[in-house]
Amino acid sequence: MIPGEVITPETDIELNVGRETLKVVVANLGDRPIQVGSHFHFYEANDALQFDREAVKGFRLNIAAGTAIRFEPGQSREVELVALAGKREVYGFAGRVMGKLD
């Protein structure tokens, strides 16, 4: 092994296997691009994004860690979300939950 070397399996690595997911259509009604990161509580995303907020409470984007999705002004697209795991407590972000989800 070489210091810093990363050895990965030859097969694809599946993310969030067995976790609850849902698909939602999101529209950017604003006049500026909006980017949402992989671990942002989607329910608390920018108010210029239009979607069923109650349906996505407790979910985040189902994309690789450290990545994001950009919504251009006037753009509408379908995204897949995955349920938050662990204690299912949310603090910070836009301050709309500040506690337990369930």
UniProtKB/Swiss-Prot annotation:
EC number(s) on record?
3.5.1.5
Signal peptide start-end: none
Q: Which GO terms describe its biological process?
A: urea catabolic process
Q: Which residues form a coiled coil?
A: none
Q: Which PANTHER family match?
A: UREASE
Which keywords does this Swiss-Prot/TrEMBL entry list? Cytoplasm, Hydrolase
Subunit comment: Heterotrimer of UreA (gamma), UreB (beta) and UreC (alpha) subunits. Three heterotrimers associate to form the active enzyme.
The first-level EC class reads: hydrolase
Reactions performed catalytically: urea + 2 H2O + H(+) = hydrogencarbonate + 2 NH4(+)
What would be the name of the gene that encodes this protein?
ureB
Q: Which family does it belong to?
A: Belongs to the urease beta subunit family.
Q: Does the keyword Cytoplasm apply?
A: yes
GO cellular component terms given for this protein: urease complex
Task: Say yes or no: keyword Cytoplasm present.
Answer: yes
| Pathway where this protein functions | Nitrogen metabolism; urea degradation; CO(2) and NH(3) from urea (urease route): step 1/1
On the tree of life, the source organism's domain of life is Bacteria
Subcellular location(s) per record: Cytoplasm
Q: Which NCBIfam families does the protein's record reference?
A: PRK13203.1, urease_beta
Q: State the protein's name.
A: Urease subunit beta
